[in-house]
Amino acid sequence: MFAVMKTGGKQYKVQAGDKLRVELLAAEAGEAVQFNEILMLGGDNVTVGAPLVEGAAVQANVIEQVKGAKLIHYVKRRRKHSSQRKKGHRQKLTLIEITDILASGGDKSGMKTAIGAGMVAVAAGAVATAAVVATKAAKKAKDAKDEAPKAAPKAEKKKAAPKKAKAEAAPAAADEGTRPANLLDAARDGKADDLKKISGVGPKLEGLLNENGVYHFDQIMAWGPSEIAYMDDKLSFKGRIERDNWIEQATAFAAEQE
């Protein structure tokens, strides 16, 4: 009776008593292992799996862990310049001896399943990776929890900000000044003074003053600091009234008219 089994990505035709080398198994010398991937059973009755034969198994003993043969690569050249060197990778293998072939009941034998050492390494790596990911996630959650109380004072400071804004708004409102009481809807007797005489006042600025009720020099000369601040802010003069001494100029021009 023979069987075709699969291990390490390769297929082997075996029968009881055979010794063969297979891809490295995760087993020690002297251990008994069982191969459960059976593709075909032969003998008096041939059974072909679809793709595996259900319940079939091949049992074997591990003799030793070995390496592949050393290969010598020989390069022949002319005039005694030939060379040779050891070449290639020495694959790690497991030498086993087939002890029995089971046509059925292999899934209930209780014998250790033959697993490739590479599969064990991959599984161990996956477990280690999962552990690292879990540790990082736990640390991240802990850090977030520790930082949560620190974020609370910032929120309180943000709530306190409107009070400060209100406190700053009060002086700003005070700096806007008081609207002059002598602003007019139209020039007296329909004749406005020539405000362009004031330094820095042109036709455009004169028109702007007229639109805001300023037509005469005596209106400007009567303004106090509060009224000056109001008109300066209203007309966006940026301190021009005080900088160009409008009050003194208006006083002089008003005196000339008298």
Curated annotation (Swiss-Prot):
Pfam families: Ribosomal_L21p. One of its GO terms (molecular function) is rRNA binding. The keyword GTP-binding does not apply. One of its GO terms (cellular component) is ribonucleoprotein complex. Residues 140-181 are annotated as: Disordered. One of its GO terms (biological process) is translation. Residues 140-159 have a biased composition (Basic and acidic residues). Keywords: Ribonucleoprotein, Ribosomal protein, RNA-binding, rRNA-binding. The keyword Ribonucleoprotein applies. InterPro entries: bL21-like, bL21-like_sf, Ribosomal_bL21. This protein binds to 23S rRNA in the presence of protein L20. Belongs to the bacterial ribosomal protein bL21 family. Part of the 50S ribosomal subunit. Contacts protein L20. This is Large ribosomal subunit protein bL21. It comes from Jannaschia sp. (strain CCS1). The gene is rplU.
